[in-house]
């Protein structure tokens, strides 16, 4: 391309003048004029929190039945919740194993009852079986 006739060749300026010209060009705009980073996020739907199922309310209800005057700390409640999850996981694994051994496609109350007898020790297993039987009877009668 040929240079335009109206343009003059660029003049060389001293270094100090160049620095003085660059500083105003680098100024940041005022904070009031900036758009917030989340301006576009208002249009998007907010993620709903994942609901986590816990046994905390049931633990608390049982505690109040047994000892109405005693409370429980949140850390202790978390430990109890983990304990119940672990026990239920062991019972589920054992009942699943029993169903597989007996070549049954379904886990019934009988597999659960046998798993309780295998997983829980002595007297605790007896009480759990009697309470479980009572709960199943109550459920089927309604």
Swiss-Prot record:
Induction: By gibberellins GA1, GA3, GA4 and GA9. The keyword Aminoacyl-tRNA synthetase does not apply. One of its GO terms (cellular component) is nucleosome. Keywords: Acetylation, Chromosome, DNA-binding, Isopeptide bond, Nucleosome core, Nucleus, Ubl conjugation. It is found in: Nucleus; Chromosome. Residues 1-51 are annotated as: Disordered. SUPFAM superfamilies: Histone-fold. GO terms for molecular function: DNA binding; protein heterodimerization activity; structural constituent of chromatin. Ubiquitous. Highest level in shoots, fruits and young flower buds, including petals, anthers and ovules. The modification N6-acetyllysine is found at residues 7, 33-34. Can be acetylated to form H2BK6ac, H2BK33ac and H2BK34ac. Monoubiquitinated to form H2BK143ub1; may give a specific tag for epigenetic transcriptional activation. SMART domains: H2B. There is a cross-link at residue 138 (Glycyl lysine isopeptide (Lys-Gly) (interchain with G-Cter in ubiquitin)). The keyword Nucleus applies. Core component of nucleosome. Nucleosomes wrap and compact DNA into chromatin, limiting DNA accessibility to the cellular machineries which require DNA as a template. Histones thereby play a central role in transcription regulation, DNA repair, DNA replication and chromosomal stability. DNA accessibility is regulated via a complex set of post-translational modifications of histones, also called histone code, and nucleosome remodeling. The nucleosome is a histone octamer containing two molecules each of H2A, H2B, H3 and H4 assembled in one H3-H4 heterotetramer and two H2A-H2B heterodimers. The octamer wraps approximately 147 bp of DNA. Belongs to the histone H2B family. This is Histone H2B.1. It comes from Solanum lycopersicum. The gene is H2B-1.
């Amino acid at each position: 391309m040929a240079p335009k006739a109206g343009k003059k060749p660029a003049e060389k300026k001293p270094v100090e003048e160049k620095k003085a010209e660059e500083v105003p060009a680098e100024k940041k705009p005022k904070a009031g004029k900036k758009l917030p980073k989340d301006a576009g996020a208002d249009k998007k739907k907010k993620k709903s929190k994942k609901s986590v199922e816990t046994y905390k309310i049931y633990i608390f209800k049982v505690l109040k039945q047994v000892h109405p005057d005693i409370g429980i700390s949140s850390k202790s409640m978390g430990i109890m919740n983990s304990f119940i999850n672990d026990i239920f996981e062991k019972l589920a694994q054992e009942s699943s194993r029993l169903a597989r051994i007996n070549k049954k496609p379904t886990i019934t109350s009988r597999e659960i009852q046998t798993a309780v007898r295998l997983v829980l020790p002595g007297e605790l297993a007896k009480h759990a079986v009697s309470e479980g039987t009572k709960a199943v009877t109550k459920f089927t009668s309604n």
